[in-house]
């Protein structure tokens, strides 16, 4: 038999109907049905063959970046730092 007998399922069904009401259960059933229908449609769309992919035309000559010399000298920037004012509250 198992844990739940048919009598247990009837009691559970009655409690669910009393808690949620028939209108909410009907709406829930409709929403679940529409979700399943959308899922099946998406699965069928995936099974259809896709449009043929157009291969892009390769460039005439491959682009090779020119080699550059590494930077050997040190560079510094002369800047002057400015002090930032502390923020003040305007509502006090």
Swiss-Prot record:
GO terms for biological process?
A: protein transport by the Tat complex
Q: Which family does it belong to?
A: Belongs to the TatA/E family.
Functional note: Part of the twin-arginine translocation (Tat) system that transports large folded proteins containing a characteristic twin-arginine motif in their signal peptide across membranes. TatA could form the protein-conducting channel of the Tat system.
Q: Which GO terms describe its molecular function?
A: protein transmembrane transporter activity
Q: What is this protein called in UniProt?
A: Sec-independent protein translocase protein TatA
Q: How does it sit in the membrane?
A: Single-pass membrane protein
Question: What coarse category fits the chief subcellular location reported for this protein?
Answer: membrane
TM stretches of this protein: 1-21
Q: Can you quote a single GO CC term?
A: TAT protein transport complex
> Which residues lie in Basic and acidic residues bias regions?
72-92
Q: Which InterPro entries match?
A: TatA/B/E, TatA/E
Matches recorded under HAMAP family: TatA_E (MF_00236)
Q: Which NCBIfam families match?
A: PRK00442.1, tatAE
Q: Where in the cell is it found?
A: Cell inner membrane
Listed A to Z, the keywords are: Cell inner membrane, Cell membrane, Membrane, Protein transport, Translocation, Transmembrane, Transmembrane helix, Transport
Quaternary form?
Answer: The Tat system comprises two distinct complexes: a TatABC complex, containing multiple copies of TatA, TatB and TatC subunits, and a separate TatA complex, containing only TatA subunits. Substrates initially bind to the TatABC complex, which probably triggers association of the separate TatA complex to form the active translocon.
Q: Where is this region: Disordered?
A: 44-92
């Amino acid at each position: 038999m198992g844990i739940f007998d048919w009598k247990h399922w009837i009691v559970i069904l009655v409690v669910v109907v009393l808690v949620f009401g028939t209108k909410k259960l009907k709406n829930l059933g409709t929403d679940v049905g529409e979700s399943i229908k959308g899922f099946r449609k998406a699965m069928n769309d995936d099974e259809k063959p896709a449009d043929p992919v157009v291969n892009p035309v390769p460039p005439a000559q491959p682009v090779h970046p020119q080699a550059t010399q590494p930077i050997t000298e040190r560079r510094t920037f002369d800047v002057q730092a400015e002090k930032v004012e502390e923020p003040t509250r305007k509502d006090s």
